[in-house]
Amino acid sequence: MCIRDSADTARAILEICLSKNPGNELAIMTLAGLHAFAGDRSHIEALAHDGFADDPIIRSIEWILSRNEMPQVHFSRWSMFDTALAAAERSRAFYEFGVWMGDSFRYLIDYFPQGYGFDTFEGLPEEWHGLPRGSYTSFGEVPNILGAEFVVGEFRDTLPEFFAHERPMAGLINFDADLYSRPSRR
């Protein structure tokens, strides 16, 4: 297994978080997952024993641990992007679903001839994990990035029309949407 950047830094940050808020379940599960990826499954097993066995995070960690080949673990999106770029077909277009302020898009577009970004640019359409509606808004401002074409609106409204026409094959897809909403029946 390859752990990119600093597992020690991630562990220290999680421990600080838990010293301030010992009941933070996400931090507890993330720290347990970090220990498990490093070879110590005791924290995951304790959480499963304490009633978290069916939690989606614990189930996801267990599934990953059950694989024959462990994935790389990254502690920054930039490290993850560099790994993805090494495997990407850079002569093709890049697609990003969930653009927000465009930081990831700006980083990735430098490696591709064309980029397409999809977002409402209005933030979360509903409350999500304690974040209020409108969090992650760019206040309707669409980034101005050379080589980019942005499609503004909800995926369920914009993707069918966009992909009804021939589009370049993807060399890389970055899916960074926070919500999955089923399309409404029309």
Where would I find each of the regions flagged by the language model?
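Short, small-residue-biased leader/transition segments that mark boundaries at the very start
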Residues: 1-3
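TPR-repeat structural position
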Residues: 6-8, 41
